[in-house]
Amino acid sequence: MAATDRLNQTSDILSQSMKKTDSSMSVVTAENPYKVSVVGSGNWGTTIAKVVAENTKEKPELFQERVDMWVFEEQIDGTPLAQIINTKHQNVKYLPNIDLPDNLVANPDLIATTKDADVIVFNVPHQFLGRIVAQMKGQIKPTARAVSCLKGFEVGPKGVQLLSDYVTQELGIECGALSGANLAPEVAKEHWSETTVAYHIPDDFKGDGKDIDHRVLKQLFHRPYFHVNVIDDVAGISIAGALKNVVALGCGFVTGLGWGNNAAAAIQRVGLGEIIKFGRMFFPESKVETYYQESAGVADLITTCSGGRNVRVATEMAKTGKSGEQVEKDILNGQSAQGLVTCKEVHQWLESSGNTEDFPLFEAVYQITYENVPMKELPSMIEELDIDSTSKCVLSYKMGL
């Protein structure tokens, strides 16, 4: 049996197993089918919109069929990108050669896309979230719910904030998060993978069939090729999803220097420890087991450090000596390497809180990216990592201290 056949057989077995054992996949109906909209149309935004639109089309008892996707309007050979998507049913710039469902409608008008939505899925580079949310204030249903697929933090005078919390604060709607070992091209090609959705049921929950809950979110995102686990640890998966991009830059540096797999593994080991420490230090409500049990944790870290935009950018930085910003422009076709922004935000917060010495890898990535510290200094910058402090952090959690 070929490897592809074995993988397909494994996926079928897992799908059948979930049908038998997962109560969240039981039949769910809504009093009024939910309208779903997606904000963002990059490769990951378009991929998630594809997943969602496939499910809304198959489940009329739960969702309205049409899914609107907000597209930042740009011209492709003189034709608006939204028009191309709606005519060819492909996002020729950010997700070429992938057919999109005909019930997925591209819309360059942000308010028209979101004003009637019951579920809003945010999937844009996180540095643009503020201006997008500002436009949406007072223009959406007050009863809407949201899921953020963004990776990063909002850093301000009051400290570091989860992007899902930022959406809730600014729009007054409950917002969860989606994160996992999900390279967009592989999901778009329907290669089997898994992800984690985290959502906290709000105090104003209206009841089964009247509001969004874990079962509804499972039905919205789960596909035979895209397995979903729904939990309530929004903080945990958000932290892991943001910080893995910083670790991936470190892996890209050592890859570009030609140091091999051993060096990349060392970066990932140190990085995982710092991710857990960051969560316990600044978001004590996060759960340690999320980092090693969920796709959004160590699985996503491994995948991101094996490929993806952040590794590509950092590798090219090491090979050419160019800045991250320049490499991003050169090779990413208008997309972003989120680690470049996140490492700066994390540095700003750690510096203001006096904790830079507690996170030597995060600080090293920042210093290399923005302060011209030679990449060859990376091993010496992280070799004094206090492993005992990370171990104590995990141990104290397990003991309930």
Swiss-Prot record:
The keyword Membrane does not apply. GO terms for molecular function: glycerol-3-phosphate dehydrogenase (NAD+) activity; NAD binding; protein homodimerization activity. It catalyses: sn-glycerol 3-phosphate + NAD(+) = dihydroxyacetone phosphate + NADH + H(+). It comes from the Eukaryota. Substrate binds at residues 151, 309-310. The active site is at residue 244. Gene3D superfamilies: N-(1-d-carboxylethyl)-l-norvaline Dehydrogenase, domain 2 (1.10.1040.10), NAD(P)-binding Rossmann-like Domain (3.40.50.720). SUPFAM superfamilies: 6-phosphogluconate dehydrogenase C-terminal domain-like (SSF48179), NAD(P)-binding Rossmann-fold domains (SSF51735). Keywords: Cytoplasm, NAD, Oxidoreductase. GO terms for biological process: carbohydrate metabolic process; glycerol-3-phosphate catabolic process. InterPro entries: 6-PGluconate_DH-like_C_sf, 6PGD_dom2, G3P_DH_NAD-dep, G3P_DH_NAD-dep_C, G3P_DH_NAD-dep_euk, G3P_DH_NAD-dep_N, NAD(P)-bd_dom_sf. GO terms for cellular component: cytosol; nucleus. Its EC number is 1.1.1.8. Belongs to the NAD-dependent glycerol-3-phosphate dehydrogenase family. This is Glycerol-3-phosphate dehydrogenase [NAD(+)] 1. The gene is GPD1.
